[in-house]
């Protein structure tokens, strides 16, 4: 006998009220809630109204304005979903009037006009033999390949040395051949070739195009030119043209019963920009009717209260939710509701910002030195939708934010997320969109496939061995089982604040965005640069970059430094801050799955919570360094000494340079206290917790360096010339021996943090380890310098003395640092050389004037360094 469904009047509600983002991230949907505080701006809602929270969805819409003749914008802004089924025809664009389309037949013509950007209209291949130098006979063939549609942002001009072909000197060869001196005077002919330096956005690489290169270029994309004819969907227009763009409605559009703005035949619109936002779709359960509505995820009002039975975990709550869910499913089509055309609500303008954009790694880690290129990217909205948004271009994707946050305001992984709560339907309803993916996704080749599958195929991540994404058709198969979710996933009571300390996971592994690597031709051009490139036109940060939420403002720091006046833009290293492609791949493999509004990773085991037993961790303990290519970022995970891959090193180029804004050119390193009783709290010998309550946000370099330094004597295989990878997450069995948290007292920018005492056993052990290191290397270096500079003087790390080679031109940046320490130069000099990325090739070209005026070296230091470059070596 079935029990009758309880009435909403019989539900007892809790006294506490919470905003939507807390509810959605804490409980699986659907759920019943009651309005506690409706606020003034929420139409159709009153206090004590009951709502069914249906689902959390990501909507991608195009903001548009109505147009009058003459391209005047009128009326309110509207939002057109990317899946809108109507067709549009492109009009004459405003930019076509202001900047008529130009066509060029060679690079030289492009350089004379020097527009902001050009597009390649046909495939171009060009070969040039580049000479290594005036006195060097080495040459290298530089192959240029440009594909149709490549977008090139112009950056400047320069000259490179090239090897003349035999035809150019054939007459001279004939003369010398007659007099028998061809072999003695047959040196390679060289000439200077002017080049146009561009950024190719397809390859994300800077290239040098010789003026001699022939080919068709245009200031309009060939795709955009093709789009001028015919009718196109809004998605097609956004992907292939550069917004803003003017369109007209050539034929009667389809109708949607949920449309709040009616698009009619003959209307004109200006597509302004793209917006991706996360909304919560709800149903207001009035006594006489049910009204669908939606809210942006981060509205402060309305606030809602939960049923007490949900907190207690009573089973009958399942039947109430299922009853109203079935009614809403029968009466309303959520997919159609999500694709409706609406007016933009002015009161939600600030609140509707996409959580994905606010927390996107690609947007929050753009160095100022590359902002000119990113500025061009963000102004081109078709690339914004395809490349920068990545898998964000969803017209109607359901998102599951459950398990990210508790109702006390702290992020946590709930017991409901353990494997025992996962079943075939349950896992299928998880829509987690990785925040760490920076891959450039290509245009879909098979439009007949479901749109969500196309965009998530490359970046799909698996959790618990099951796919996290699926098509809409697959999602519908599980709708009939949705009623079992509340009882299965909403039965556990909220964790207490004390228990939250054991469940925190603050790991954020966000690799920096890909930056253009230095091509071989540019390397050659930089060595003998006759005319330095014109500096970028836009040195300001890109304006369209979304604002960073308050929680991330202290974490994200844009770092840059002005290049030395005598070094070119490329030699100064501003172009080479990012990570290589292979490291990007490895980092994306290791990066945890995350969803907004939290960043959390899968639990290795459901009992990981019991591993961490102490700490005063807070949300303020988020590290400032978000660019480790693996999982360790200083979160509340166990750190095992044995897990450190001591025999593996990362190159210096794997990590961006860490410089805080406003620091002088010469580093003034902060001190790191390894002595005294204030260094570490009581820990076991093998492992310790890395929860750092007293560590400032800017101390991540020092914290990670301290780990490497303390463990340096455990493995002689670890080369001190490059940092060891940070520790990986512990296995469940390794976390049982954790004791009190580690506290690292540091001085960062003059700010002194609290010092905790430590156990005598650990102190004695640590002192002996420290003393052994000091006996071997005799000099301690401050840890505020970058990791690759923490090198022992005159040592390779395996005990053998560092011996610089006779030819210094082939040294890497790390080896140049070793060489400078080898001849006894101070640490601030070494750090300045590293910050300028001086390798051996640049080192041997430094003159006395550059060293004294630009590098600010003393006369003695200049003399010693020049003698060292010329072959002098100190006696060991």
UniProtKB/Swiss-Prot annotation:
Superkingdom to which the source organism belongs: Eukaryota
KW Chloroplast (keyword) present: no
Composition bias, Polar residues: 461-471, 556-569
A GO biological-process term: positive regulation of cell division
Bias (Pro residues) ranges: 532-549
One Pfam family hit: CABIT
Functional summary from the UniProt entry: Adapter protein that may provide a link between cell surface epidermal growth factor receptor and the MAPK/ERK signaling pathway. May promote cell proliferation.
Family: Belongs to the GAREM family.
Name of the protein in its database record: GRB2-associated and regulator of MAPK protein
Species whose genome carries this gene: Xenopus laevis (African clawed frog)
